[in-house]
Amino acid sequence: MMNLIPKTNFDFLKIRKYFYAVSAIILIAGLICILTRGLNMGIDFKGGTMVQVQFTESITIDQVRSAVEKYNPEIQSYVGKNTYMIKIKGSQENVNEVRSDVETSLTAAKLKFTVVATDFVGPTVGKDLGERALWALALSLVFMVLYIAFRFQNIIWGTAGVIALIHDAFFMVAAFAFLQKEFDLVIVAALLTAVGYSINDNIVIFDRMRENIKENPKESFYNIVNRSLNETLSRTVITGSTVLIVLVIIYFFGGEVLKNFSLIMLIGVIVGTYSTLFIATPIVYDWAKDSDNFAKTVGNQDVALAAEIKTAKKHNKKKHR
């Protein structure tokens, strides 16, 4: 297969500490943004009124949104029923007022409809959904660590990958806090999807590193890591670019419903590609070069040597006590 990107020989590890610093600065800024601005929680988490409306004529979701857009609603369609659920944030005391406002707006837009039901989703339900979302994210990270550790026979690979995933997830959440985009269950789904994309990128590079270690056991681990990153760079960039093109198209032409989903996916793919090259793999190198267990697993010359030096230092310390 022809590489669209010429063969490269970048020294990724030489500049890794600069990118550690860049990530640290961005993450601190993101934390400050989350603490000061907070997340713009959607009705799924904050609570609000849900008005189910059935129209007598065929109507698109954009027409419904246009009629009630001043209330900043979330709108869900029911396939084949010409029925829509209009969700608007607010307290329980405002349920009747919200229903009346929706009816007035739809009537003003000259739409023929019937209000089927009106319900209120309280903050307790929103809290429960939030806890479930956190559990989903936490469990996905745990299983990813276990899977990578099992596949590569060492916990270092899995832990490095998950550190990068936490980095990516935090960056995406911080970006939404900064932009004050609505954070709901759709965004949680997009978050998990982006995390899955990122770990796949990491596994591709980790697998190449493992193969290069087996084929060249006497080669410096430093060189193996750099070579593996360069050998997979074309695949990483082309795959990321292809996904980005699709997401940009969805963002601009997919309608209002998919706008926030595609936006957080865009952020996730960009940050995920960055963390794969400059965070996850360098962490494996920095951690592995001082690990006895890793040296036994991969049998690489300079990793094993680092482990022997580390053991010798421990022995000398005990001897001089």
Curated annotation (Swiss-Prot):
Keywords: Cell inner membrane, Cell membrane, Membrane, Protein transport, Translocation, Transmembrane, Transmembrane helix, Transport. Its main location: membrane. It comes from the Bacteria. It is found in: Cell inner membrane. GO terms for molecular function: protein-transporting ATPase activity. GO terms for biological process: intracellular protein transmembrane transport; protein targeting; protein transport by the Sec complex. GO terms for cellular component: plasma membrane. Gene3D superfamilies: Multidrug efflux transporter AcrB transmembrane domain (1.20.1640.10). The chain crosses the membrane at residues 19-39, 133-153, 159-179, 186-206, 237-257, 264-284. It is a multi-pass membrane protein. Coiled coil: none annotated. Part of the Sec protein translocase complex. Interacts with the SecYEG preprotein conducting channel. SecDF uses the proton motive force (PMF) to complete protein translocation after the ATP-dependent function of SecA. Belongs to the SecD/SecF family. SecF subfamily. Forms a complex with SecD. Part of the essential Sec protein translocation apparatus which comprises SecA, SecYEG and auxiliary proteins SecDF. Other proteins may also be involved. HAMAP family: SecF_B. This is Protein translocase subunit SecF. It comes from Elusimicrobium minutum (strain Pei191).
